């Protein structure tokens, strides 16, 4: 499907006029002094590419985390992310990943496998997360732990909702995020 600039502008105008969900980006930037960072990256205007942002937004709205963690909507930011990673000891990155499997396949890369994730450049984003983490490691102490959780996208077309295969696995992605945080000593209390 080829989109013209008119199609894109029309779609954005319809979205802006809709009663649909709004993402207040400022609300997703917690104080950056926490040692644990939950980072969702992606472009919410491109269906499945926005997976990471959708996941962290939903978790932030649904849970209170103890001890406090930094929950960051990294969107399509690049080096600006370094500002929000000061003092970070552990990072959990949620992203769309091109791994060559069926759409909706969930990937999980623990710290020791992150080099493979970054070396093969399988993130769908052009922003070099590997470069950001390497610069951060030079600036500060190395990370104690890091995990990447991602999903194989079906669509990177213009659209505001993830595709059906990605939507089906979102609950499991959120469960995996909560499990990793629990392993790091973070409890998640459901907001009522």
Can you say where each PLM-predicted feature lies in the sequence?
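Short "lid" loop at the C-terminus of a central beta-strand within the Rossmann-like core
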Residues: 154
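N-terminal catalytic or cofactor-binding beta/alpha core of small enzyme domains
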Residues: 2-143, 148-151, 160-171, 179-192
């Amino acid at each position: 499907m080829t989109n013209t600039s008119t199609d894109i502008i029309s779609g954005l105008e319809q979205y802006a006029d809709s009663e649909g969900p709004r993402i207040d980006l400022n609300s997703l930037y917690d104080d950056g002094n926490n040692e644990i960072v939950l980072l969702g990256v992606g472009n919410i205007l491109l269906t499945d590419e926005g997976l990471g942002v959708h996941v962290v937004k939903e978790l932030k709205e649904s849970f209170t985390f103890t001890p406090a963690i930094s929950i960051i909507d990294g969107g399509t930011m690049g080096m600006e992310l370094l500002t929000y990673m000061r003092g970070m000891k552990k990072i959990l990155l949620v992203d769309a990943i091109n791994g060559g499997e069926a759409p909706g396949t969930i990937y999980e890369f623990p710290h020791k496998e992150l080099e493979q994730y970054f070396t093969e450049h399988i993130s769908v984003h052009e922003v070099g997360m590997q470069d950001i983490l390497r610069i951060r490691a030079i600036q500060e102490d190395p990370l104690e732990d890091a995990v990447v959780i991602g999903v194989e996208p079906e669509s990177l077309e213009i659209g505001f909702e993830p595709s059906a295969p990605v939507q089906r696995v979102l609950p499991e992605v959120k469960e995996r995020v909560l499990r990793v945080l629990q392993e790091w000593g973070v409890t998640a209390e459901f907001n009522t």
